[in-house]
Amino acid sequence: MGELQFKWLFWRSFAESGGTFQTVLIFLFIPYSLTVDYRATPVLSDTTFVWVWNVPTEACVENVTEPIDLSFFSLIGSPRKTAIGQPVTLFYVDRLGNYPHIDAQQTEHHGGIPQKGDLTTHLVKAKEDVERYIPTDKLGLAIIDWEEWRPTWMRNWTPKDIYRNKSIELVQAADPAINITEATVRAKAQFEGAAKEFMEGTLKLGKHIRPKHLWGFYLFPDCYNNKFQVDNYDGQCPDVEKKRNDDLDWLWKESTGLYPSVYLKKDLKSSRKATLYVRYRVLESIRVSKVSDESNPVPIFVYIRLVFTDHVSEYLLEDDLVNTIGEIVAQGTSGIIIWDAMSLAQRSAGCPILRQYMKTTLNPYIVNVTLAAKMCSQTLCKEKGMCSRKTESSDAYLHLDPSSFSINVTEAGKYEVLGKPEVKDLEYFSEHFKCSCFSKMTCEETSDMRSIQDVNVCMGDNVCIKATLGPNSAFHLLPGKGLLLMTTLAHILHHLPHDIFVFPWKMLVSTP
């Protein structure tokens, strides 16, 4: 078999930020506490970004001649009801306690609405279910998928407005003389209070009996920025939805993992709207992750699908992967969970098609962004933080520059990266990205990327970039200009508050 080579387009711009400095660079270090930004510490050692596979593809892995390659996924679990003891566990409505809800046929289960549910009985049953699906406590993800109702009253719009209507009816049954306005106010308070008790109580139970797992609810947080039909769609989360997320502070404080979703419909195929949609959903998740403790954010794992939700036979294109995976990685989250239903592997020729897609499209891009993110963390953040965009609206991505690297598949089916980073690659990181320090850690950005001598980053089955960079340019003050520079700097310092500096400043100049 011949060697298959990928020459990756560097989607969006890769700024050529290299070149010899023509001017003096004066680094004035302001107090650290004014500029620090945090992200959750990696949940796995030496793994800046975690890939999670949550697809029932056992048929594509076991007892097949050419299995799909899952070597880049650190956590693998099937969402099948029969699967237990996995590092990623997804609890649907029928797998965790006695979740009160109303099904599509309007049949009420366990009381139907939260106010009529039995919390004590629910928690007893939930404990049994957790112990069944997670028999031993070791590092893993525990995601509760309760989508029948939302804990925020106003978010239960059609068809979920049945929960509001039933709640109002409950109040009216207890007090027939009450007017509709007062009944609605009372119903809202009762519904939201009971919803909080069920969700908060379930999280506390899970954390108590399986504390090493990261507990949270699927689709939380959400910001409902999906009105794609409006003119000049900008992806921004509506202020009212951000305020509603603020009102769910009890949920964010109790969660040890956040699990938002950025699934795409086909209308967003290769679309700028998809970029903006994903961007601001992830940014809202980052904001929410800091509610409990800004210096110790909650880990964020973003759910994606490899197909369009309304056209499940069509896989995402490379541009779509950039709009989802690329956006998520560039903003500095903990990882990505790839989910899909059984049909992904059961469709006609499902496994061979999935295997080919992963081999030629998905896995090479995973290699691309993961190694770029690790290289940025190592060189810019000294491995004490992860890289995130300096500017929220930026289209900068953590990609390997195709003029420096190529990603190959060897005859043995293994991936390898050819090439080595150049100074311009590292300076691209420092120009467009900042260091978000890992929780409770002090990190300092590399001030001069030309000082980097070695790069050594790996992922998966020994897929690495190992390189020694060339000698640095010598920096010195140009003859005859030293006095002018010192005079200018002294003038600047004289007009600044005396206590602003806590670190030494550096003055670097190079010859043209």
Swiss-Prot record:
Gene3D superfamilies: Aldolase class I. Disulfide bonds join C60-C351, C223-C237, C376-C387, C381-C435, C437-C464. It is a lipid-anchor; GPI-anchor. Glycans are attached at N63, N165, N179, N368, N408. One of its GO terms (biological process) is fusion of sperm to egg plasma membrane involved in single fertilization. GO terms for cellular component: acrosomal vesicle; external side of plasma membrane; membrane raft; plasma membrane. Keywords: Cell adhesion, Cell membrane, Disulfide bond, Glycoprotein, Glycosidase, GPI-anchor, Hydrolase, Lipoprotein, Membrane, Signal. One of its GO terms (molecular function) is hyalurononglucosaminidase activity. It is found in: Cell membrane. It catalyses: Random hydrolysis of (1->4)-linkages between N-acetyl-beta-D-glucosamine and D-glucuronate residues in hyaluronate. Residues 1-35 form the signal peptide. Its EC number is 3.2.1.35. It comes from the Eukaryota. The active site is at E147. Involved in sperm-egg adhesion. Upon fertilization sperm must first penetrate a layer of cumulus cells that surrounds the egg before reaching the zona pellucida. The cumulus cells are embedded in a matrix containing hyaluronic acid which is formed prior to ovulation. This protein aids in penetrating the layer of cumulus cells by digesting hyaluronic acid. Belongs to the glycosyl hydrolase 56 family. This is Hyaluronidase PH-20. It comes from Rattus norvegicus (Rat).
